Design a protein with these regions (language model features):
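Catalytic nucleophile serine of serine hydrolases
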Residues: 42
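Patatin-like phospholipase
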Residues: 1-38, 49-289
């Protein structure tokens, strides 16, 4: 599937994906798109959608708008509809910062894009290629976490939840399907360590879904650490370039402010530009030898 292809993978992270928005805008700014395949997890799917749509700055501006609107995050709705109102997010996205789906489909000609989803019935991970007709529904489903959002979303008659629940960093899946050249954009910092003082651990205690999803949400951070350890242990012929913040980001999954989003976005923008510079420097060095 991914043999001889350059694969771009984006981790999710709620408002932490303002970092990813910065990286992707740096890529757009420098017309850097050598990728053959894209894999999106949770909010990473939104970043990829705007990137493929060639909507520079839209995801960043959308998050700035949402964090200032009390209708998006409501603590009073945590046990009924979820902390974050995803339907409101897509209403804002459509009206003020719309995707250009025709351009996105054009960008994917000869390429492939997979959205990571968790089947709400059995907790299994599924990897789907969106069509023009179901792109929005798949992206909503990919960001739907019990308690933090409404919990599940229907796509083609099947209930799905956030793919990050079951596979938050799908490098192993990519490698198992032939990938040897991967760029991973993370929202967890370089020295990430699991902690129980996190919203997803708290949320797991109130989930009434099947036991696998409950366990996966509770162990979400351990699964990220396992993925990082897996990457570190890969053989030399499998290349994984990681673009990640050096320290903990200012934003959290659902806690936010315009200042924090701007800081994380600028950190991502700088990280993206630095990565492109390093790629060009490496390419230039190879040409001279």
């Amino acid at each position: 599937m991914f043999e001889n292809k350059k694969v771009l993978i984006l981790e999710g992270g709620g408002f932490k994906t303002s970092f990813s928005a910065g990286v992707m805008d740096a890529f757009q700014m420098q017309a850097h798109n050598p990728f053959d395949s894209y894999i999106g997890v949770s909010g990473g799917c939104i970043a990829i959608s705007y990137f493929l749509s060639k909507r520079y700055g839209y995801f960043y501006q959308c998050m700035r708008t949402l964090c200032q609107d009390e209708r998006f995050v409501k603590y009073s709705k945590a046990f009924t509809e979820g902390l974050m109102n995803l339907d409101f997010f897509y209403d804002i996205a459509y009206k003020e910062f719309p995707f250009d789906f025709q351009t996105a489909m054009q960008s994917l000609k000869g390429k492939e894009y997979y959205i990571v989803l968790t089947n709400s019935a059995d907790g299994a991970t599924e990897y789907h290629q969106p069509t023009l007709e179901n792109w929005v529904d798949m992206t909503i489903a990919a960001s739907t976490v019990p308690m933090l959002t409404k919990g599940k979303h229907v796509v083609n008659g099947i209930h799905y939840s956030d793919g990050g629940i079951s596979d938050p960093v799908p490098v192993k899946w990519a490698v198992e399907n032939g990938a040897t050249d991967i760029v991973l954009i993370r929202t967890t910092h370089h020295n990430f360590k699991p902690s129980r003082l996190r919203p997803e651990y708290f949320a797991s205690k109130f989930i009434r879904a099947n036991q696998k999803i409950k366990d996966d949400v509770e162990n979400f951070q351990n699964k990220i650490k396992e993925s990082i350890d897996y990457i570190d242990a890969l053989p030399e012929h499998i290349k994984v370039d990681q673009i990640a913040p050096k320290v903990v980001l200012n934003s959290n999954i659902f806690t936010n402010s315009v200042k924090n989003i701007e800081l994380d976005y600028r950190t991502g923008l700088e990280a993206g530009l630095n990565y492109i510079h390093s790629v060009k420097a490496e390419s230039s060095m190879l040409k001279t030898h």
